[in-house]
Protein backbone atom coordinates (compact mmCIF):
# COMPACT_ATOMS: atom_id res chain seq x y z
CA UNK A 1 0.00 0.00 0.00
CA UNK A 2 1.43 3.37 -1.02
CA UNK A 3 0.38 6.20 1.29
CA UNK A 4 1.05 9.92 0.84
CA UNK A 5 -0.02 12.59 3.33
CA UNK A 6 -0.20 16.08 1.81
CA UNK A 7 -0.12 19.24 3.90
CA UNK A 8 2.00 22.33 4.54
CA UNK A 9 5.42 22.23 6.21
CA UNK A 10 3.87 22.99 9.58
CA UNK A 11 2.89 20.75 12.56
CA UNK A 12 -0.82 21.66 12.66
CA UNK A 13 -2.99 19.05 14.38
CA UNK A 14 -5.21 18.45 11.35
CA UNK A 15 -2.21 16.90 9.60
CA UNK A 16 -0.22 15.74 12.64
CA UNK A 17 -3.03 13.42 13.70
CA UNK A 18 -2.45 11.40 10.51
CA UNK A 19 1.33 11.79 10.41
CA UNK A 20 1.68 10.65 14.00
CA UNK A 21 -0.81 7.79 13.62
CA UNK A 22 1.22 6.38 10.77
CA UNK A 23 4.54 7.01 12.51
CA UNK A 24 3.41 5.43 15.78
CA UNK A 25 2.16 2.43 13.82
CA UNK A 26 5.49 2.07 11.97
CA UNK A 27 3.62 2.45 8.69
CA UNK A 28 5.68 3.77 5.80
CA UNK A 29 4.30 6.89 4.13
CA UNK A 30 5.39 9.86 2.08
CA UNK A 31 5.15 13.09 4.06
CA UNK A 32 4.58 15.52 1.19
CA UNK A 33 4.71 19.16 2.28
CA UNK A 34 3.69 21.82 -0.22
CA UNK A 35 4.16 25.58 -0.34
CA UNK A 36 1.45 28.17 0.14
CA UNK A 37 2.02 29.19 -3.49
CA UNK A 38 1.18 25.71 -4.72
CA UNK A 39 -1.85 25.62 -2.45
CA UNK A 40 -3.24 28.70 -4.18
CA UNK A 41 -3.19 26.66 -7.39
CA UNK A 42 -4.83 23.74 -5.56
CA UNK A 43 -7.67 26.02 -4.47
CA UNK A 44 -8.15 27.09 -8.07
CA UNK A 45 -7.93 23.77 -9.91
CA UNK A 46 -8.17 20.99 -7.31
CA UNK A 47 -4.85 19.30 -7.97
CA UNK A 48 -1.17 19.51 -7.13
CA UNK A 49 1.40 20.61 -9.66
CA UNK A 50 2.25 16.91 -10.16
CA UNK A 51 -1.36 16.13 -11.06
CA UNK A 52 -2.54 14.53 -7.79
CA UNK A 53 -6.24 15.30 -7.30
CA UNK A 54 -7.21 17.11 -4.09
CA UNK A 55 -10.90 16.55 -3.21
CA UNK A 56 -12.76 19.72 -2.21
CA UNK A 57 -9.57 21.72 -3.01
CA UNK A 58 -8.57 21.48 0.69
CA UNK A 59 -5.74 20.13 2.82
CA UNK A 60 -4.87 17.81 4.43
CA UNK A 61 -5.26 15.15 1.79
CA UNK A 62 -4.34 11.47 2.01
CA UNK A 63 -3.56 9.51 -1.14
CA UNK A 64 -3.80 5.72 -0.88
CA UNK A 65 -2.81 3.79 -3.99
CA UNK A 66 -3.78 6.77 -6.19
CA UNK A 67 -7.11 7.32 -4.39
CA UNK A 68 -7.37 10.74 -2.73
CA UNK A 69 -9.18 11.16 0.60
CA UNK A 70 -10.14 14.54 2.08
CA UNK A 71 -11.20 15.88 5.48
CA UNK A 72 -9.38 15.54 8.78
CA UNK A 73 -11.78 13.10 10.43
CA UNK A 74 -11.91 10.61 7.58
CA UNK A 75 -8.13 10.70 7.16
CA UNK A 76 -7.53 10.32 10.91
CA UNK A 77 -9.85 7.33 11.21
CA UNK A 78 -8.28 5.59 8.22
CA UNK A 79 -4.76 6.08 9.58
CA UNK A 80 -5.87 5.22 13.10
CA UNK A 81 -7.30 1.90 11.98
CA UNK A 82 -4.07 1.01 10.20
CA UNK A 83 -2.02 1.77 13.31
CA UNK A 84 -4.42 0.43 15.98
CA UNK A 85 -5.09 3.92 17.31
CA UNK A 86 -8.77 3.70 16.31
CA UNK A 87 -10.92 0.62 17.00
CA UNK A 88 -12.23 -1.51 14.15
CA UNK A 89 -14.67 -3.70 16.12
CA UNK A 90 -15.61 -1.51 19.10
CA UNK A 91 -18.24 0.95 17.95
CA UNK A 92 -18.71 2.59 21.35
CA UNK A 93 -15.01 3.36 21.77
CA UNK A 94 -14.92 4.60 18.18
CA UNK A 95 -17.79 6.99 18.87
CA UNK A 96 -16.06 8.25 22.02
CA UNK A 97 -12.94 8.98 19.97
CA UNK A 98 -15.01 10.69 17.27
CA UNK A 99 -16.47 13.18 19.75
CA UNK A 100 -12.98 14.46 20.59
CA UNK A 101 -12.09 14.82 16.91
CA UNK A 102 -15.30 16.80 16.43
CA UNK A 103 -14.78 19.13 19.40
CA UNK A 104 -11.21 19.76 18.25
CA UNK A 105 -12.60 20.70 14.85
CA UNK A 106 -15.24 22.97 16.42
CA UNK A 107 -12.62 24.84 18.46
CA UNK A 108 -10.33 25.16 15.44
CA UNK A 109 -13.12 26.65 13.33
CA UNK A 110 -14.05 29.05 16.13
CA UNK A 111 -10.50 30.40 16.33
CA UNK A 112 -9.67 30.33 12.63
CA UNK A 113 -12.85 32.16 11.64
CA UNK A 114 -12.22 35.01 14.11
CA UNK A 115 -10.15 38.07 13.28
CA UNK A 116 -7.10 38.65 15.48
CA UNK A 117 -8.58 41.80 17.01
CA UNK A 118 -11.67 39.84 18.12
CA UNK A 119 -9.85 36.90 19.72
CA UNK A 120 -9.68 38.42 23.19
CA UNK A 121 -13.46 38.56 23.10
CA UNK A 122 -13.83 34.89 22.10
CA UNK A 123 -11.24 33.91 24.72
CA UNK A 124 -13.39 35.53 27.39
CA UNK A 125 -16.56 34.07 25.89
CA UNK A 126 -17.10 31.10 23.62
CA UNK A 127 -13.58 29.63 23.63
CA UNK A 128 -13.41 29.59 27.43
CA UNK A 129 -16.88 28.05 27.54
CA UNK A 130 -15.90 25.24 25.15
CA UNK A 131 -12.64 24.54 26.96
CA UNK A 132 -14.41 24.44 30.32
CA UNK A 133 -17.00 21.99 28.98
CA UNK A 134 -14.26 19.82 27.46
CA UNK A 135 -12.18 19.94 30.64
CA UNK A 136 -15.13 18.98 32.84
CA UNK A 137 -16.04 16.06 30.57
CA UNK A 138 -12.68 14.34 31.02
CA UNK A 139 -12.38 11.46 33.49
CA UNK A 140 -8.76 10.48 33.05
CA UNK A 141 -7.72 8.42 36.09
CA UNK A 142 -4.13 8.78 34.90
CA UNK A 143 -5.02 7.15 31.58
CA UNK A 144 -5.61 8.36 28.04
CA UNK A 145 -8.95 9.80 26.94
CA UNK A 146 -10.73 6.62 25.87
CA UNK A 147 -8.67 3.69 27.20
CA UNK A 148 -5.32 2.79 28.73
CA UNK A 149 -3.73 3.20 25.29
CA UNK A 150 -3.11 6.28 23.20
CA UNK A 151 -5.60 6.93 20.38
CA UNK A 152 -6.16 9.54 17.71
CA UNK A 153 -8.39 11.36 20.23
CA UNK A 154 -5.38 12.03 22.45
CA UNK A 155 -3.27 13.17 19.51
CA UNK A 156 -6.04 15.53 18.38
CA UNK A 157 -6.44 17.24 21.76
CA UNK A 158 -2.67 17.41 22.33
CA UNK A 159 -2.11 18.85 18.87
CA UNK A 160 -4.95 21.36 19.14
CA UNK A 161 -3.81 22.65 22.52
CA UNK A 162 -0.23 22.77 21.31
CA UNK A 163 -1.36 25.03 18.48
CA UNK A 164 -3.46 27.26 20.73
CA UNK A 165 -0.54 27.80 23.13
CA UNK A 166 2.27 27.98 20.56
CA UNK A 167 2.50 31.78 20.13
CA UNK A 168 0.97 31.44 16.65
CA UNK A 169 -2.43 32.86 17.62
CA UNK A 170 -2.72 36.51 18.58
CA UNK A 171 -5.10 37.41 21.38
CA UNK A 172 -5.11 34.10 23.28
CA UNK A 173 -3.00 33.83 26.45
CA UNK A 174 -0.25 31.19 26.36
CA UNK A 175 -1.18 30.06 29.87
CA UNK A 176 -4.80 29.34 28.99
CA UNK A 177 -4.52 25.71 30.14
CA UNK A 178 -3.77 26.68 33.74
CA UNK A 179 -7.54 27.00 34.08
CA UNK A 180 -8.15 23.55 32.56
CA UNK A 181 -6.11 21.00 34.49
CA UNK A 182 -7.67 17.87 32.96
CA UNK A 183 -6.85 19.04 29.44
CA UNK A 184 -3.36 19.95 30.60
CA UNK A 185 -2.89 16.48 32.12
CA UNK A 186 -3.74 14.62 28.93
CA UNK A 187 -1.49 16.92 26.91
CA UNK A 188 1.43 16.28 29.27
CA UNK A 189 0.83 12.53 29.07
CA UNK A 190 0.86 12.54 25.28
CA UNK A 191 3.86 14.86 25.27
CA UNK A 192 5.91 12.21 27.10
CA UNK A 193 5.23 9.46 24.53
CA UNK A 194 8.62 8.24 23.22
CA UNK A 195 7.53 7.89 19.58
CA UNK A 196 5.94 11.33 19.59
CA UNK A 197 9.18 12.78 20.90
CA UNK A 198 11.06 10.98 18.12
CA UNK A 199 8.75 12.55 15.54
CA UNK A 200 9.13 16.01 17.06
CA UNK A 201 12.91 15.78 16.93
CA UNK A 202 12.81 14.58 13.33
CA UNK A 203 10.32 17.05 11.87
CA UNK A 204 9.62 20.09 14.06
CA UNK A 205 11.55 23.35 13.67
CA UNK A 206 14.22 23.68 16.35
CA UNK A 207 12.67 26.84 17.82
CA UNK A 208 9.01 25.76 17.56
CA UNK A 209 7.06 26.18 20.81
CA UNK A 210 4.66 23.28 20.51
CA UNK A 211 2.65 23.88 23.63
CA UNK A 212 2.50 25.50 27.03
CA UNK A 213 0.91 22.63 28.90
Which ranges hold each PLM region?
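GST superfamily/GST-like fold recognition
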Residues: 97, 145-184, 190, 200
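Acidic, Mg2+-coordinating catalytic module of metal-dependent nucleases/exonucleases
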Residues: 137
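Secretory-pathway/luminal and periplasmic proteins that interact with or process carbohydrate-rich
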Residues: 106-110, 166, 212-213
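Residue-level recognition of oxygen-bearing side chains
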Residues: 74, 182, 195
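Alpha-helical packing segments of well-folded alpha/beta enzyme cores
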Residues: 18, 126-130, 134, 160, ...
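Short acidic/histidine-centered micro-motifs embedded in hydrophobic/aromatic stretches
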Residues: 100-103, 158, 202-206
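GST-like domain detector, emphasizing the conserved glutathione-binding G-site
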Residues: 1-131, 140, 145, 149
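C-terminal helix/juxtamembrane-tail motif
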Residues: 189, 194-213
